[in-house]
Amino acid sequence: MRRHLIALTAAVTLAVAAVSSACTGDEAAVSRDGANATVVRVVDGDTVQVDIDGQREKLRLIGIDTPETVKPDTPVQCYGPEASAFTKQLLPEGTAVRIERDVEARDDYGRLLGYVYRADDGLFVNLEIVAQGYAALLTFPPNVAHVDEFVAAARAAERANLGLWSACSG
């Protein structure tokens, strides 16, 4: 009887471990080598919903911060609607993209973290949003693979008074 109970406990433990690892999906959604995806919708200027192999995921663009438009208990911020519209222009519904990871797969809210490139022309979307003045630099180490590019783009946009650097500076 005791052996049967030990075997049953071991089987249940293994089953729970298998289900738990299958449900986390942190590594599976976007491997270190990246993943192809399709844009389902733009949530706001720095968050999009994507389809990766039939699975819908919210994806937070690494390295950038656009003014808020949909954050609960937060008023719409200066240049937020414009930033969201610009991201929608860059990533219309159905756009094929390539997502690259950095060190961390997800943020504290469970969203995937990634660098997004349009499949048709290779445009680095995160960088373009900063370069055109629709986002400020936002870095959370250890996710810093492109920080130098983002710093240069943000400085250039600010010097040129592009986007939020012009509209929200007063």
What are these regions (language model features)?
Residues R2-G170:
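Small beta-barrel nucleic-acid-binding modules, primarily SNase/OB-fold domains
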